[in-house]
Amino acid sequence: MQTGTALFIIDMQNDFILSGRPLCVDGAMQTVPQIKKLLDYARSNDWTVIHVIREHDKNGINADKPRRYLFENGMNGYCVAGTEGAQIIEELHPLDNEIIIKKTRNSAFFRTNLDSVLRCLKIKNVVISGTQYPNCIRGTAVDAMSYDYDVIVVTDCCSAKTPEIANANIIDMKNMGIKCITLEELQNS
């Protein structure tokens, strides 16, 4: 791929990756080595790297409605700004020149400046990795397509609760016209 490409690494934060967390995604930790390879590839090809993260107020007021219960009755919530749980996992830590987009909903585009950032940088191609398929991966991929970006989801660099959920989402996204390929296929294209 040429310049004008951005790699999104979505929600690779402690509260989604580490075992025992309320919203830990089964299989997410297993994708870390593959995402690291993709990240190294993106960096070596001078792609724009964008780390997309969830970040919520400690009272959960800006969390999506179905998950606000995680902030109630003495529960500590998830991805609370400034906490260890909201931090990007160490293996994928951003470099100083990489962009961090903070979101409060599934899509990285919803109520963020992501589209403006991409247009300012003359990005045409969006490569998506991270967790998890039915929520943030799919929401971001569909919105990127709706904004007329060429979208690639790197299938072995994304995760879901089960392989069946991942496969169902891959089929749906392919049917929408979103390119879904492996890291090896991306590197050989």
Give a label for each model feature:
Residues 1-6, 33-45, 57-63, 69-189:
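Active-site-adjacent betaalpha module
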Residues 7-12:
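N-terminal nucleotide-binding beta1-loop-alpha1 segment
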Residues 15-19:
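Short acidic, Gly/Ser-rich segments with clustered Asp/Glu that frequently serve as metal-coordination loops
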Residues 21-28:
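Short glycine-enriched, charge-decorated loop/helix-capping segments at active-site entrances
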Residues 54:
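Conserved H-loop
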